[in-house]
Amino acid sequence: MASSALNNLVAVNPNTLSPSPKSTPLPNTFSNLRRVSAFRPIKASLFGDSPIKIPGITSQPPPSSDETTLPIRQIPGDYGLPGIGPIQDRLDYFYNQGREEFFKSRLQKYKSTVYRANMPPGPFIASNPRVIVLLDAKSFPVLFDMSKVEKKDLFTGTYMPSTELTGGYRILSYLDPSEPNHTKLKQLLFNLIKNRRDYVIPEFSSSFTDLCEVVEYDLATKGKAAFNDPAEQAAFNFLSRAFFGVKPIDTPLGKDAPSLISKWVLFNLAPILSVGLPKEVEEATLHSVRLPPLLVQNDYHRLYEFFTSAAGSVLDEAEQSGISRDEACHNILFAVCFNSWGGFKILFPSLMKWIGRAGLELHTKLAQEIRSAIQSTGGGKVTMAAMEQMPLMKSVVYETLRIEPPVALQYGKAKKDFILESHEAAYQVKEGEMLFGYQPFATKDPKIFDRPEEFVADRFVGEGVKLMEYVMWSNGPETETPSVANKQCAGKDFVVMAARLFVVELFKRYDSFDIEVGTSSLGASITLTSLKRSTF
C-alpha cells in the first residue's frame, strides 16, 4: 500500500528548515527529479462536528464543466499485445524496473504525466489491467470527484479479493457512495470515532509507554532494538483500548493480533505485492493465481470472535440502523485491522524514518516546541489545545504523509466521457475507462512543491499551509472533510491525531534517536540504535 521504494530520496538538510510554498515554475515533467542515495541516519471528526482546521484554506470543488483552455492531446502509451503486454508490464513493475522506475521511465518516454499502461496483477487474476496513469497534482484529484468516477470494487485496483476473506460481504471500502449500505456503514464508523474521542489521548500514551519499555529493554540488552514488531503490537492495543475499552492481552486473542492480521492482509494484497521471494515463485504463487482463502480462515475467525465480543455496543447500534450484527462486525474488523492498523503499520515506521534521517537539529526543535507547549498550554499534560500550539510537529506529520503516503495506489472508473486536465494538456477520457493515480508522484509534483523529493520539516508552517490541499493521503485533499457522499477515509482526522501523538510522545520522552532503515513488503523496516532520554 504505502510506497516502500522511497529509501533513496534526498534527505532533509537540517540546516535549512524554511517554509516552502510554491516557487518558480519548473520544467514540464519529472525528468529533473534528483535521486541521491541517503543512507545516513538522518463529515465527522475526532474533534467534534468539525474537521481539523487548516488556517487560511478554503477548499474549492473541482470545476464541473468540460471546457478547457489547454490543448487537447491524445493520451499517449499503449497496452501491448493481449496477454503479453500485461505480463511484460507486471514484470517491469515488480522486477525489471521496480515501481518508481516503472512510472518514471514511461513519464519520460511519453513526456507526459498522463499515459496508458497495464497495472498488476493482470493475467490470470484481473480480467482487465488497462488503466490511464495519473502522476501530477492537477490530474490526480479527479479520482476524488464522485461526479466523474465510481469506486465500486476498486479499493485494491483492477482486481477485488474474494469476499470469502471478509465473511462473504463486500466491505465498505469496496462500496461506491451511490450504494445504500455505504451511508449506513460509513456513518457507523463516524459514530464510533466520535463517541470514543475522549479515550484517544490517554490510551495512546499508555500504549506508547508499553512500546518504549520494549525498545529500551532491547537496546540495553542487545545494543539495538527492532521497532516494527513492538510498534505493531502497540498500535493494535491502542486501537482496541481506544475504540472498545478492551485490552487484547486479557482476551483469548492475547498478543496474536499483529501476526494474524499480517497473514490475512497478505491474502488480500498478494497479487500486488512483492514479498522478497524469487521472481519465478512470486509469479507462480502470488501474481498469477489467488491464494486460497481457506488457508487463513481460522486466523480470521479468531479476529472475528474478538470483535464480536469487544465491539458489542457498536454492533447494537448497527442493528438499530438496519445493519446485521454479522455484516457490521466484518466491517468493524476490516476498518480496525486493515484500514487503521494496516495504515499505522506503514505510517509509524515512516515517521521514524524521516524524522530520524533529519537529524539532531530537527529533534531538538521538536523537543523544545513539544515540551514548551505541554507546560504552557497543557498544564503539564498532552492535550488537544497544547498540540495546536506545535506548528513544527504538525508540519512534520503532514510532510511525512506527503512524501510517503500510506496508500500509494488509487483508482476510479469513469462514469461518463469527460475532459481530464494535467498541467500541460487536456485529454479525452471515455466512460468505463479505469483511472489510476500513483500518489507519491502527485504529492511530489515539482510544479507545486519546492524541493519536492526532500523531507522539509517545516514545509507546512506559516504560508506553507496553503499547500495542504495537495496532501491527499486520505483519498481526498487534507482541506476537505470525509462524508457519506465521498470515499475519503472515515478516520482521516483520527489518523492525523494518532500521528501527532506519536511525535509528541516520542519527543516528550527523548531528546534524539538514531536508526537504521531497511525495507519490507509494506513500508520501512526500522532498527533503533540509540535513544537519548530527555535532559530538559
From Swiss-Prot:
The gene is CYP74A. Pathway: Lipid metabolism; oxylipin biosynthesis. (13S)-hydroperoxy-(9Z,11E)-octadecadienoate binds at S262, N339, K345. Residues 1-58 form a transit peptide. Its main location: plastid. Its EC number is 4.2.1.92. GO terms for cellular component: chloroplast envelope; chloroplast thylakoid membrane. Its cofactor is heme b. It catalyses: (13S)-hydroperoxy-(9Z,11E,15Z)-octadecatrienoate = (9Z,13S,15Z)-12,13-epoxyoctadeca-9,11,15-trienoate + H2O; (13S)-hydroperoxy-(9Z,11E)-octadecadienoate = (9Z,13S)-12,13-epoxyoctadeca-9,11-dienoate + H2O. It is found in: Plastid, Chloroplast. This is Allene oxide synthase, chloroplastic. CDD domains: CYP74. Cytochrome P450 enzyme involved in the biosynthesis of oxylipin jasmonates, important phytohormones acting as growth regulators and signaling molecules for plant defense. Functions as an allene oxide synthase that converts hydroperoxy fatty acids to unstable allene epoxides. Catalyzes the dehydration of 13-HPOTE ((13S)-hydroperoxy-(9Z,11E,15Z)-octadecatrienoate), as well as 13-HPODE ((13S)-hydroperoxy-(9Z,11E)-octadecadienoate). Belongs to the cytochrome P450 family. InterPro entries: Cyt_P450 (IPR001128), Cyt_P450_E_grp-IV (IPR002403), Cyt_P450_sf (IPR036396). It holds the Pfam family p450.
